[in-house]
Amino acid sequence: MHDIKAIRDNPQAFDAAFTRRGLAPIAGSLMKLDEVRRAAVQAAEQAQARRNAASKEIGDAKKAKDNARAEALMAEVTELKTTMPALDAAVKEADEALKKALSEIPNLPLPEVPEGADEHGNVEHHRFGEKPSYSFTPKPHYDLGEALGMMDFEAAAKLSGARFTVLKKGLARLERAIGQFFLDVHTGDHGYTEVNPPLLVKDDAMFGTAQLPKFREDQFAAGAIGSGGEGYWLIPTAEVSLTNLVRESILDEKELPMRLTALTPCFRAEAGAAGRDTRGMIRQHQFTKVELVSITTPEQSKDEHERMLSCAEEVLRRLGLHYRVMTLCTGDMGFASQKTYDIEVWMPGQGEGGAYREISSCSVCGDFQARRMDARSRGSDGKPRFVHTLNGSGTAVGRALIAVIENYQQEDGSIAVPDVLQPYMGGLKVIAKA
């Protein structure tokens, strides 16, 4: 969420950055809402101040035995008591209107983010490795998985409907191995602290990381739980749980950056555009992901963003997968992001002749989420300030499974197990039909 004071101080600069997202200028309408709020606050404060002063004057009038003045002042206080609830209600209404407006507009892109309307405006940053070559035509993961008897979409549809998958035997074990491998690298080599967070969160948590209110329809609501009747949400990403661990807190800057990671199921009601990726595991309502979250000072966040990207890349490098890194343009960035790198892994079984598919997004959010969460830090000067937050996939386990299946497929339909995963598979080198 944005700082209305900063918008008031320089509305032209705010609109210049905001319109780079392809959106209309908005600073003027926000300042009008703020003017209404400030006027309401001023009226309420003046009424309270007059009530306090009049109450004191009543005592003075009584001491002076000025009964007429005392009675007039008491009548004034009574009238103020009657009008003040309406003034307080006006303040609350104006506050909520401004907060709602601020909560529904996206973060501002950093100056170096390329301009563009959609994914076609994204810019390649760099790439790793080469596309593998085959003496046969590579198959998509769903054909390979079904032929192995280890990927069952029909059974999943009976249980849950479209966009779910049942994994069995070797592929179920392979997905588990990938997730464990990712966690071991990030905790053992990259210094992240492993967390096992709740999968159900409250409204405040979803608001804090900016899934609510704008993306309410994209989420799975778990309904009312318990006698309190409070609703819960299934997390769309562990970013929600991990980032909100610092909500409503003041951290010691000596402890920053704080780096957290979690391997969790994720749940998303929006599984992509209608008719797109309807087969296979690319777009699922439920999927597994290793999330990376960093909490930093403003001075640390830029370097931390580059570091997070390299951590996400490293697990793919160790798997021997070819990928490219894209800098997302202003029109393709996420709502809370200031700048985002997407890692797109090569999948030879996708489309005609293979395709790059997103497997990780690494974003720096500045203080956008911190303001929503009231997450601050205190440095040597003793003054609290908002932290910066970053999040990234380290990486999506289901898509990494697809990438391994398609890149390591063999002509007979079996799947070679990458060397780094074999210890997690009990030494198994090939997944084949029994």
From Swiss-Prot:
Known catalytic reactions: tRNA(Ser) + L-serine + ATP = L-seryl-tRNA(Ser) + AMP + diphosphate + H(+); tRNA(Sec) + L-serine + ATP = L-seryl-tRNA(Sec) + AMP + diphosphate + H(+)
Subcellular location: Cytoplasm
E.C. code: 6.1.1.11
PROSITE patterns for this protein: AA_TRNA_LIGASE_II
An annotated Gene Ontology molecular function: serine-tRNA ligase activity
Annotated positions binding L-serine: T237, A238, E239, E291, S393
Enzyme class of the recorded protein, top EC level: ligase
Binding site for ATP: R268, A269, E270, E358, I359, S360, S361
GO cellular component: cytoplasm
The entry's keywords: Aminoacyl-tRNA synthetase, ATP-binding, Cytoplasm, Ligase, Nucleotide-binding, Protein biosynthesis
SUPFAM superfamilies: Class II aaRS and biotin synthetases, tRNA-binding arm
Entry-linked InterPro entries: aa-tRNA-synt_IIb, aa-tRNA-synth_II, aa-tRNA-synth_II/BPL/LPL, Ser-tRNA-ligase_type_1, Ser-tRNA-synth_1_N, SerRS_1_N_sf, SerRS_core, tRNA-bd_arm
CDD domains recorded: SerRS_core
Signal peptide: none
Pathway noted in the entry: Aminoacyl-tRNA biosynthesis; selenocysteinyl-tRNA(Sec) biosynthesis; L-seryl-tRNA(Sec) from L-serine and tRNA(Sec): step 1/1
Domain of life where this protein originates: Bacteria
GO term, biological process aspect, one: seryl-tRNA aminoacylation
Subunit structure: Homodimer. The tRNA molecule binds across the dimer.
Free-text domain note: Consists of two distinct domains, a catalytic core and a N-terminal extension that is involved in tRNA binding.
PANTHER family: SERINE--TRNA LIGASE, SERYL-TRNA SYNTHETASE
Function statement: Catalyzes the attachment of serine to tRNA(Ser). Is also able to aminoacylate tRNA(Sec) with serine, to form the misacylated tRNA L-seryl-tRNA(Sec), which will be further converted into selenocysteinyl-tRNA(Sec).
Family statement: Belongs to the class-II aminoacyl-tRNA synthetase family. Type-1 seryl-tRNA synthetase subfamily.
Name of this protein: Serine--tRNA ligase
Gene from which this protein is expressed: serS
